[in-house]
C-alpha cells in the first residue's frame, strides 16, 4: 500500500498525526527546521535522508523522547504535547527503535510485559506472543532469555512488543538494520 492508497476509498479521511513547523536545535545545530506533514489512517510513509538528516530526532519527538523547540504536533485533530513514551503509548503511538533496549537477564515475555499495562499473566502474554509471532512469521519464543538471543532475534522481540501494544500509529526507526536478509 502506498501513501495514496486507502483500505476503503469510500471512508472519510482520518488524520492520525499532523506536524506543523516542527523545529529542533541542539546548540547551534539544527536537526529539524520547519517540518510538517500529515499521516492518515491506513497510510505508510517513509522518512528518507542521509545520516544526520534529523529523521530519528523527528520520530523521537513524535514518541515523546524529545520535545520540539517550536511547532505543533496534532494527534487525531487535537494539539498535543507528547510528554513521554508512556504518554505516546497511551495515545496509541508505538515505536520500534533502531537501537533497542531489552533487559538481558529477563525472558522475552518478561521484557514485553514491561511495556504493557499491568494485569495480564505471563502465561497469557506468552500465548499472545506466540500467536503474534506466528501471525507475522517472525518466530519469537516468549520463554527464551534475551541474553541467549541473536541481535536479529532481539530486534524481532522489539517488533512483537510494539505490535502487542496495538498502536494506531506504528513508527519504525530502521527496524530491520540488524536483521539478516532471511529475517
Task: Tell me what each language-model feature is.
Residues 2-183:
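Glycine-rich phosphate-binding loops of nucleotide-dependent enzymes
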Amino acid at each position: 500500500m502506498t501513501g495514496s492508497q486507502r483500505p476503503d476509498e469510500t471512508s472519510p479521511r482520518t488524520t492520525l498525526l499532523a506536524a506543523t513547523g516542527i523545529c529542533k536545535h541542539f546548540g547551534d545545530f539544527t536537526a529539524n527546521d520547519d517540518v510538517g506533514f500529515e499521516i492518515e489512517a491506513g497510510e505508510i510513509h517513509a522518512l528518507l535522508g542521509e545520516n544526520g538528516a534529523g529523521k530519528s530526532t523527528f520520530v523521537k519527538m513524535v514518541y515523546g523522547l524529545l520535545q520540539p523547540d517550536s511547532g505543533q504536533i496534532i494527534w487525531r485533530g487535537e494539539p498535543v504535547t507528547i510528554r513521554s513514551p508512556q504518554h505516546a503509548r497511551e495515545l496509541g503511538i508505538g515505536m520500534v527503535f533502531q537501537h533497542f533496549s531489552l533487559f538481558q537477564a529477563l525472558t522475552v515475555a518478561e521484557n514485553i510485559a514491561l511495556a504493557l499495562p499491568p494485569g495480564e499473566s505471563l502465561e497469557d502474554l506468552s500465548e499472545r506472543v506466540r500467536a503474534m509471532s506466528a501471525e507475522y512469521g517472525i518466530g519469537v519464543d516468549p520463554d527464551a532469555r534475551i541474553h541467549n538471543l541473536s541481535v536479529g532475534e532481539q530486534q524481532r522481540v522489539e517488533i512483537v512488543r510494539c505490535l502487542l501494544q496495538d498502536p494506531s500509529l506504528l513508527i519504525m526507526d530502521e527496524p530491520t538494520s540488524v536483521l539478516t536478509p532471511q529475517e
